[in-house]
């Protein structure tokens, strides 16, 4: 996993696992709403009444409907929260 994905992947994974409704704003201003069904390096699969494949390069902002706690990882893959008592 590249360094650029050290926050993005865990964040999207929490949204997916907890089925948190999100609003995704695209760079052209369009707002999409739904739940993150899946994602990879290039796309996010957003599910509402239908599934939409949204290319990450077109995404400006992801806004969850409630606060999200993301488990941060150290370079070796261990949880930073474990060491800090979090």
UniProtKB/Swiss-Prot annotation:
Transmembrane portions of the chain: none
Signal peptide: none
UniProt keyword terms in alphabetical order: RNA-binding, Stress response
InterPro entries: Hfq (IPR005001), LSM_dom_sf (IPR010920), Sm (IPR047575)
Family (UniProt): Belongs to the Hfq family.
Described purpose of this protein according to its UniProt entry: RNA chaperone that binds small regulatory RNA (sRNAs) and mRNAs to facilitate mRNA translational regulation in response to envelope stress, environmental stress and changes in metabolite concentrations. Also binds with high specificity to tRNAs.
Protein name according to UniProt: RNA-binding protein Hfq
Native source species: Saccharophagus degradans (strain 2-40 / ATCC 43961 / DSM 17024)
